[in-house]
């Protein structure tokens, strides 16, 4: 980060919004498995199920952070810049800019690398499917641009912001897949994008159903719907990696 590279002003609210809401979703999915045991007292899960609800309302106030990130959309999708690759940083160095960031205004002027370039380096089926979904979202923004009323409609912006958040996360995941290539297998990456494709389709359907969506917008939302590529072998290999971590962590009270 620097005065000429302020991309972090998108990534920070994105993390606050998306990580906190996904934390809730993880707890909900675990609760479906744990069922009644999730109500037992004096367990970690009983505490987690209660406290996880606070994060999206406190640290990651969702509607506030989505209102922030949508300001970046025009430049992100249609006005890219060129920045040098950022390597993995694990060195001991004083990050002077952290304490001298300056004002946070001018969010709409911040530019980003062309996200499409990083997608070109991967050939996993679900990565390609997700790239197709993004292309339709770009068409949505260019040809069925939300009107002035929709841009003030928080409910509409929440749905659109969710789609944008998935695109940014996908770009960051792929960039880091290159940096941590020894730790991230092609199977794992494809399985991650299996989730992203489904989440994007869910978000597109939500946007389709908004009361203010137009016929043109609805048609484009339907074109965003995709089913991820099914690969039982890939799923099994990823499951074996996860299953091997069982009992690797023990909570100390």
Pin down the residues of each PLM region.
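Flavin-dependent oxidoreductase catalytic core characteristic
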Residues: 1-253
